[in-house]
Structure formats: structure tokens, C-alpha cells
Amino acid sequence: MIKLGSTDITNVMLGTTKVDAIFLGNTKVYPNLPAVEGVYVYHVDKKFYTFPEFQKLSNTNLSQVLGFAIVDSNGSFLLPPRVNLSNDYRWCPENFDTFLVPDVGIGVDDLNGRQNTEIMHDTFQNVAGSNKYAAGYAYRFTPVPIGTNWYLPSIGELLIIHKYRSELQDRVIDIFGFSYFSYKPFWSSTQQDATTAWLLDANNDSYTTSLKSELNTALPVIKLG
């Protein structure tokens, strides 16, 4: 947090425009992520709240939520306020038997979801129906006004998120009244071999590989920090 003397600065303005972030070189100094690992509400005021803190606010509608933050020492991520669980996507729109992304076969050690997503977008952006596959859907995901940096997480990143799955699921059900996670598996952007890719079955606490042509859901994320 930036301080003026001993006072925390909570709003930074450039003229009449509110500044969302300040960097010193490549280091983000405003705003800071929460110091404690866990699940947070990212509010429209661009602050992170624990769920108990959020419940004390005057307006606790989902419309006040820009996303849910997973803060972990191995990686922190912003998740959408609500995931479209009714849509099914193939892993890629074509070339189901082709190597597409790097780090093939490393499985849970892959933490390069953003890179994987960009490679697939570059490969398929001119293919008819290119938004009908998991990484294409995630790349074009713009549900809230916080930028266009969404991507399909790698299997390693999904497993970090999965550590907080029960807490996030319970909190969202209690406060907002809907189930955040689906009974369907989530595709990762990690390829296992020429014909299969990794997915996370959050409902059954398992991860495995599946044929790229199979239909599963997708969880877009933004990397934080």
C-alpha cells in the first residue's frame, strides 16, 4: 500500500481520473494483493474484501462484484463473478491430432496458461467458429470492465484454484444463492499429447486427460500480481 506519512492512500487520481494501478519498473505497488492466502471478493470499488467484510457492506448484490480472487503463494487469480456452466467447448476447433502448445506432457507442472491461450488464439483466430473452443472462449471473455487479459488456465493453475474450491463454492451459495462450480469438468490449456489435453473434474476432486474433441466447460481467469 502506498502511504502519505502514516496514512494509507486508497484512491489515486491523475487529474480527475482514478488510477487503477501504479508500477515501479515491473513491480506493482498499488493496489496490493491481500497478504493472507484465501478467497476474496473483488469489489467494483477496486478493493479486495474477505467474504465477511463484503457482507457488512450496504450493497451485497452480485452486481457489485467484479470477480472472486484466489490468493496463493504459488499463484493468484481473478475468477469471473459467475461462470457460464451451460456452454460446452472442445479443446480446439480442429487439428485434434496435432501438437499445438509447448510444455507437452509436463502435466501439473505447467503454469503457462496465458501463453498456451495466446498460442491457440494465434493459431485459430481465422478459423470459422474459432470462439467455440475453450481457449477461444476464455480469450474473448469480457464480462466486466477490467480489461481483456482473460485466458484458459493451465492444469497447474487450475489445481491451485481447486485448493480453494470448497470455500468459494460454499461462500457463493450462502451469499448469492447459486452454485459456482459445475458437475462438468473444466478444460485446462495444457496439452498432454497430440490427441488429448488435461482437464479438472472439480466435483470429483480429480484431474485427468481427455480427447480434445470432447465437450467440457471452461473457466476464464486473469493472473494477479
Q: Where are each of the predicted segments found?
A:
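Intrinsically disordered, compositionally biased repeat/linker segments
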Residues: M1-N32
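Generic structural motif
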Residues: T7, T17, T27, L85, ...
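Short, solvent-exposed secondary-structure boundary motifs
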Residues: M1-G5, F54-T60, D170-Y183
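Short hydrophobic/aromatic-rich beta-strand motifs
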Residues: V12, A69, P185-S189
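A generic structural signal for short, solvent-exposed coil/turn residues
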Residues: L4, L14, V71-D72, S179, ...
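C-terminal, surface-exposed recognition/capping segments
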Residues: G147-N149, I155-G225
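Short, compositionally biased
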Residues: F23-I146, K212, A218-G225
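A broad, structure-centric signal for solvent-exposed, well-ordered loop/edge residues
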Residues: N11, A21, P31, N87, ...
